[in-house]
C-alpha cells in the first residue's frame, strides 16, 4: 500500500482509543529560538535545545524547527481537520530521532526518524501575549527568502494547549519529502485576528510575472485516508460522532487565556502601577474560581 499522505481529516468516531499511549514528556524549557525565516511559503523558526520523550516514543526526539500555516480568512487555515472542522491556523513542531540517527537529513530517510507535533490556532477576540512574540518578529522577514535573529525571550511551553491528549498516525511531512509520525493536539490555542492577519502581509517568491505577492494562505487540503491507515487517540473516545473534541468548551478556554493575560499584567505592573496590578490579580482569582466550578459541571455532564 502507498504511504499515507499528510495532512488528513481526523474522524474522532473512527479513531482507536489506546490506553498504552501515555502522556508525552515535553522538555521545551531549554529550547531557544535562534533564527526566524520567511521561506517564501511559510514562517519557520529554528530552535536549539528542547526535546520530547515518553508516550509511545522509543527515545528522545530533538526539536528542530517550528512552521506556521494560515488561510485567507480566519475561518480556515489549518492543514489537519478534526471531524471536517478546519481551524484558523496550525503550528507544526518538527523533531528528529537524534539518538538513532546522526543528523536531521539522515533521520528523514526513515519512518521512525521524524515526529511532528501539530497545534491548532483558533481566532477569538483577544490577543495571545505569547504568540505575539512571534508576530513582533515578522517585520524583519517581510521579504521572501529572508531570515533574522530571533531577538526576543521566548518560551515555547507557553504555546502548548491546556490539554495534551493527542491523536497520532503515520503520514508524511507536509511537502511529502519524508515519512513522519504525527502527534496532533485537538485542543487549540487562541489568538487574535490581528495577529494572524500580520502573516498575510509577508511576501512570497516571485510569481510567473516575476513579481512577489503576499502569502495570503499556505495551508494544504487533506488527503483521503488509505484503507490501512489507523489513527490512534491517547484518551477515551466518549464524544458524539458529530462533535469535534477541539470545539468543546470554547468559553472555558477563553476564560483560561484571559486569566493568563491578567496574570501577565500583574507581573508587568507589580513594580509600578500597584493598583492596576492588584485589580489584575483579583481577576485571576475570580477567573480561577469560575473555571473550577465550570470544569466540575462539565465533568458531571460527561458522566451523565
Residue ranges and their predicted role:
Residues 1-304:
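Alpha-carbonic anhydrase
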Amino acid at each position: 500500500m502507498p504511504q499515507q499522505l499528510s495532512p488528513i481529516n481526523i474522524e474522532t468516531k473512527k479513531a482507536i482509543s489506546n490506553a498504552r499511549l501515555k502522556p508525552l514528556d515535553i522538555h521545551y524549557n531549554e529550547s531557544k529560538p535562534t533564527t526566524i525565516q520567511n521561506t517564501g511559503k511559510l514562517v519557520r523558526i529554528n530552535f536549539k535545545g528542547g526535546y520530547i520523550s515518553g508516550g509511545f516514543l522509543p527515545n528522545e526526539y530533538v526539536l528542530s524547527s517550528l512552521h506556521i500555516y494560515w488561510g485567507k480568512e480566519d475561518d480556515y487555515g489549518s492543514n489537519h481537520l478534526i471531524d471536517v472542522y478546519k481551524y484558523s491556523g496550525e503550528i507544526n513542531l518538527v523533531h528528529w530521532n537524534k539518538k538513532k540517527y546522526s543528523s536531521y537529513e539522515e533521520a528523514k530517510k526513515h519512518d521512525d526518524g521524524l515526529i511532528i507535533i501539530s497545534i491548532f490556532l483558533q481566532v477569538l477576540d483577544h490577543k495571545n501575549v505569547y504568540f505575539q512574540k512571534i508576530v513582533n518578529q515578522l517585520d524583519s522577514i517581510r521579504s521572501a527568502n529572508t531570515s533574522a535573529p530571533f531577538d526576543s525571550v521566548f518560551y515555547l511551553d507557553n504555546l502548548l494547549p491546556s490539554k495534551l491528549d493527542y491523536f497520532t498516525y503515520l503520514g508524511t511531512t507536509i511537502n511529502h519529502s519524508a515519512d513522519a509520525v504525527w502527534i496532533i493536539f485537538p485542543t487549540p490555542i487562541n489568538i487574535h485576528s490581528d495577529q494572524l492577519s500580520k502573516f498575510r502581509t509577508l511576501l512570497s517568491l516571485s510569481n510567473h510575472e516575476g513579481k512577489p505577492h503576499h502569502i495570503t494562505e499556505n495551508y494544504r487540503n487533506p488527503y483521503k485516508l488509505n484503507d490501512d491507515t489507523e489513527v490512534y487517540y491517547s484518551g477515551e473516545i466518549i464524544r458524539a460522532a458529530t462533535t469535534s473534541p477541539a470545539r468543546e468548551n470554547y468559553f472555558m478556554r477563553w476564560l483560561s487565556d484571559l486569566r493568563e493575560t491578567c496574570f501577565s499584567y500583574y507581573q508587568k505592573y507589580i513594580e509600578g502601577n500597584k493598583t492596576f496590578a492588584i485589580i489584575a490579580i483579583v481577576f485571576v482569582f475570580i477567573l480561577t474560581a469560575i473555571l473550577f466550578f465550570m470544569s466540575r459541571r462539565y465533568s458531571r455532564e460527561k458522566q451523565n
